[in-house]
A protein has these predicted regions:
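N-terminal hydrophobic targeting signals that begin at the initiator methionine
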Residues: 1-2
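Early transmembrane hairpin module of multi-pass membrane proteins
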Residues: 5-171, 175-190, 216-277
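A generic alpha-helix propensity feature with a strong bias for hydrophobic helices
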Residues: 59, 204, 283-285
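Hydrophobic secondary-structure block in the mid-to-C-terminal portion of proteins
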Residues: 210-212
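Short, highly charged, low-complexity non-transmembrane loops/tails of multi-pass membrane proteins
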Residues: 276-286
Length: 286
């Protein structure tokens, strides 16, 4: 069974990658355009103010301790990634071109900002200096999340499609689009663009892995990342249900699962370093 699946999967990937480069780019762009069109046709998504009422995560007698402390998972992964890449601690250094590592640095910086933004959103009430979680403070949490998703998409574009396009063009444009999604929410109250910028990058990253040859990135890590992000989203959407199952709120668990998803990218880069050691001059796989 496993051998049959592997053979079918390999045949699918090969059949896609033998298409002309322009055709593969059009497949990717067409998919993105279709998803964007469907999002625009959907009704506006407004922020439910009840969203801020999270299931209990009390620990050590402190209300909502878990939902705040779980942001430490983001902080650990983000700082670890910044240290490993920013100080070139991945050895051998897997990046072959100047600037190739910048999307990953911004990705892990975004993860740190998520830890800070989410803590600010959740913890202020318990520190006694504001009225509690609100859409106004949630904006900073979500803005940081757009940095994470946009930088990651730019990294995969740069690795598998074109380095210059990924780093010099896609990265600033996508980061700007993420900021625009928050401005749109602030002005119109509509969250469609924000939700689109969470879901679409994951879909496009998986498609990029199928359509274009391997570089530093690997499909298995992207798939695991998507899995953990998907599980995190489930726990967030069914916060109270998860609490009913295990006596602990799903939103706090979401933080930990999403941090694991981010760690998959660091694991992928560490693996790329090991491959660089065993193969001094790697090239894209056929």
């Amino acid at each position: 069974m496993t051998g049959s699946f592997t053979g079918t999967w390999t045949a699918l990937v090969v059949s896609l990658r033998v298409l002309p480069f322009a055709a593969r780019v059009w497949i990717l762009a067409g998919t993105a355009a279709l998803v964007v069109a469907l999002a625009l046709l959907a009704p506006p998504v407004l922020q439910d103010e009840g969203y801020h009422d999270f299931a209990p995560t009390a620990l050590f007698g402190v209300p909502d301790f878990g939902i705040v402390a779980s942001n430490g998972a983001f902080l650990v992964v983000g700082v670890w990634g910044l240290w490993r890449i920013g100080f070139r601690r991945i050895a051998p250094w897997p990046f072959r071109s100047p600037g190739e590592h910048w999307p990953y640095l911004i990705f892990f910086l975004g993860v740190v900002l998520v830890a800070l933004g989410s803590t600010y959103y959740h913890a202020g009430y318990h520190a006694g200096y504001r009225a509690g979680p609100s859409s106004e403070t949630l904006l900073w949490d979500r803005l940081a999340m757009t940095v994470v998703f946009m930088a990651l998409l730019a990294a995969f574009i740069g690795d598998r499609i074109h380095l210059g396009v990924g780093v010099a063009v896609a990265l600033p444009l996508l980061l700007g689009l993420g900021a625009l999604s928050m401005a749109a929410w602030h002005v119109t109250g509509d969250l469609r663009l924000y939700h689109l910028l969470q879901a679409l990058p994951i879909l496009l990253i998986l498609m990029i892995c199928l359509l274009f040859p391997d570089g530093l990135t690997r499909f298995k890590y992207a798939a695991w990342m998507a899995f953990w992000f998907g599980l995190a989203t489930f726990c967030d959407l069914f916060d109270d249900t998860v609490y009913g199952w295990i006596g602990f709120g799903g939103h706090a668990i979401k933080h930990v699962l999403a941090a694991i998803a981010c760690f998959m990218i660091l694991a992928m880069l560490e693996d790329a370093g090991r491959r660089t050691e065993t193969t001094p001059a790697p090239g894209p796989s056929p």
